């Protein structure tokens, strides 16, 4: 697996995309249920049922995907188990 270092500006862009993903998760559950999504600049730029498929699509269309938030949008209900 390839490891990439992000400079400050690109890391901030990545953080903004992750923040947007978290803030909009409920909307994404309705619009992109059970899909992997790529977020850039406050919008979904691609989605796919498989992570491999999404990454292949992104690499075809973009030269640098390091700032994208790439996450899975699950509709499964999370339960907290306290022991």
Q: What are the functions of these language-model segments?
A:
Residues 70-83:
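Short, mixed-charge low-complexity intrinsically disordered segments
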Residues 49-64:
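A short, charged, amphipathic alpha-helix used as a generic interaction element across diverse proteins
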